[in-house]
Amino acid sequence: MASQGTKRSYEQMETGGERQNATEIRASVGRMVGGIGRFYIQMCTELKLSDYEGRLIQNSITIERMILSAFDERRNKYLEEHPSAGKDPKKTGGPIYRRRDGKWMRELILYDKEEIRRIWRQANNGEDATAGLTHLMIWHSNLNDATYQRTRALVRTGMDPRMCSLMQGSTLPRRSGAAGAAVKGVGTMVMELIRMIKRGINDRNFWRGENGRRTRIAYERMCNILKGKFQTAAQRAMMDQVRESRNPGNAEIEDLIFLARSALILRGSVAHKSCLPACVYGLAVASGYDFEREGYSLVGIDPFRLLQNSQVFSLIRPNENPAHKSQLVWMACHSAAFEDLRVSSFIRGTRVVPRGQMSTRGVQIASNENMETMDSSTLELRSRYWAIRTRSGGNTNQQRASAGQISVQPTFSVQRNLPFERATIMAAFTGNTEGRTSDMRTEIIRMMENARPEDVSFQGRGVFELSDEKATNPIVPSFDMSNEGSYFFGDNAEEYDN
């Protein structure tokens, strides 16, 4: 990206640091995941989980959700002011699964939030360690991205369900900070802005008074985050228009939807980080690995290496395919829900199938599901190669548009063409080029028309052997150019419901 110089790296955003050198970044990210690991071990001790139960991904998710809930200030305050029946605002909990006489049992646990916060701080040298909390939020967000499609949410805001590849991070909580903003897709930002504008249209006090001033600041900040994701001058200029509007309304919504569509070809830069379940960090810490001393990166070989040596289990429903369950979690671990399946398959070393062909539901088990028939199996989270995660949209040479498939947001920095159906996308751009943004719209459409699907993105970038930790010998894969590689293609995934 043109303006990369002023940006902090992911890891700095993730750890709340000022500009640091590579070694300091690796150390502070290591400190962050080490803290998560120590917290997890302590929780397993508190709950008296066996080694096997501690490696169960469902137990990991429950423990992660408890700590996130314990630190959710706004919700805690809300719960205390609006007491609801049967909800104790000072307690948090969830299902813990235990192995009893060859069967899995569900046990609902309840803990004081204060106690959970104490354990978390103790594991993090007495600090609140917000970076670690954000890291867990991003892992949950990546899991949701791989598991559910957001068709309904897209349609509700007037966007097209085919824009699902722009929806990375759509389930991240608002409090996820700069690290959270970095991983949000263009569609996610557009949807948040449209919701805001719609509230302003329906509620005339929304932009007024002291509260309205704060709302306005939030609106402009979100516009700037979205602007920073676009890589062409025309798209950025349109974002300036949207941000500066005196009274945001339908014209701004139109502009935002136009921009979201344009991002299918002129892709935005969206960060990708491999965030792993807490139990994986716990296993490593328990085996004596010192993350802070060794250093850690979310975008290099480290997460791949960690997954090579971790054995994680998952509960499996009667008619689910364990291999598909493994694929789902693998994609979540590497933030690869919107990556081209050809690239994912090559890196993973086994064929990655589209969502519609998978026989598996989500990882979490609902409280009304029957435990009698539950089995468990090992998740296969290893990979054949590793590759560097990208934060660019894979557009060829900075300012020019590159081909974008109707549903790919690249995760790995690996050379490939980005096949796309230009006719399908361009059909969405008929008509409306009048109004104050007409010259920008015309310019954007011209760039999109000039994009060629055969253009190669990430020229010369390849994958690496797992023994090649310094990334010295890139292996540039050759892909079947005609093969369309979208995960949500022809899909029947469940909708995401809060």
Curated annotation (Swiss-Prot):
GO terms for molecular function: RNA binding; structural molecule activity. A motif (Unconventional nuclear localization signal) lies at residues 1-18. It is found in: Virion; Host nucleus. GO terms for cellular component: helical viral capsid; host cell; host cell nucleus; ribonucleoprotein complex; viral nucleocapsid. InterPro entries: Flu_NP. A motif (Bipartite nuclear localization signal) lies at residues 198-216. Keywords: Capsid protein, Helical capsid protein, Host nucleus, Host-virus interaction, Ribonucleoprotein, RNA-binding, Viral nucleoprotein, Viral penetration into host nucleus, Virion, Virus entry into host cell. Residues 1-21 are annotated as: Disordered. Signal peptide: none annotated. Late in virus-infected cells, may be cleaved from a 56-kDa protein to a 53-kDa protein by a cellular caspase. This cleavage might be a marker for the onset of apoptosis in infected cells or have a specific function in virus host interaction. Belongs to the influenza viruses nucleoprotein family. This is Nucleoprotein. The gene is NP.
